[in-house]
Curated annotation (Swiss-Prot):
Protein name: Superoxide dismutase [Fe]
Record lineage: Bacteria, Bacillati, Bacillota, Bacilli, Lactobacillales
Subunit and interaction comment: Homodimer.
Organism from which the protein derives: Enterococcus faecalis (strain ATCC 700802 / V583)
Cofactor binding, note field: Binds 1 Fe cation per subunit.
Catalytic reactions of this protein: 2 superoxide + 2 H(+) = H2O2 + O2
Superkingdom assignment: Bacteria
Length: 202
């Protein structure tokens, strides 16, 4: 079995004006697709690895043969992270969090605004390429960031929200102003999906 590029769960222009259609085409059809292609190439001589979900694959990097471990880390992480990213966004979404995730955010951070501030710090403070995350770690919400295409799954944490802060995710529209992109992201967060992930992670 090989890994495949998932279709976007919405049209390429569905997240306009916050994420532009050209970026979505490049990000999904080119960048994400390249991670899938390179992951399949990496595991070609280890077909048993392709039987695992990509999330399971990257959750135990020590089980990956050493000669392909870096390639699987980078490309398996890229595939898992982007698949997750498309799913936690939606058109006509955003706004305030709801349900159990709202309660947990308020309890952990004090308010949604305080959580957004901490998330922004993680996202802007990530030097170079990487991701900012809201994760469940030992049953508690935490904000973290990872370099490159590393996933919280590699550290035993479960992501419930994530933002790609590689320049390819925002440069066409936001140029070098990463904070504007981070602010725009909150308009497309799919809180229903975040709640679903949060319920499964607890």
């Amino acid at each position: 079995m090989t890994y495949t590029l998932p279709e976007l769960p919405y049209a390429y222009d569905a997240l306009e004006p916050y994420i532009d259609v050209e970026t979505m085409h490049l990000h999904h059809d080119k960048h994400h697709n390249t991670y899938v292609t390179n992951l399949n190439a990496a595991i070609e001589k280890h077909p048993e690895l392709g039987e695992k979900s990509v999330e399971n694959l990257i959750s135990d990097m020590n089980a990956i043969p050493e000669d392909i471990r870096t390639a699987v880390r980078n490309n398996g992480g890229g595939h898992a992270n982007h698949t997750f990213f498309w799913e936690i966004m939606a058109p006509n979404a955003g706004g305030q969090p709801t349900g159990a995730i709202k309660e947990a955010i308020d309890e952990t951070f004090g308010s949604f605004d305080e959580m957004k501030a901490a998330f922004k710090t993680a996202a802007t403070g990530r030097f170079g390429s990487g991701w900012a995350w809201l994760v469940v770690n030992n049953g508690k919400l935490e904000i973290t960031s990872t370099p490159n295409q590393d996933s919280p799954l590699m550290d035993g944490q479960t992501p419930v929200l994530g933002l790609d802060v590689w320049e390819h995710a925002y440069y066409l529209k936001y140029k070098n102003v990463r904070p504007d992109y981070i602010e725009a992201f909150w308009n497309v967060v799919n809180w229903d999906k975040v709640n679903e992930l949060f319920a499964a992670a607890k």
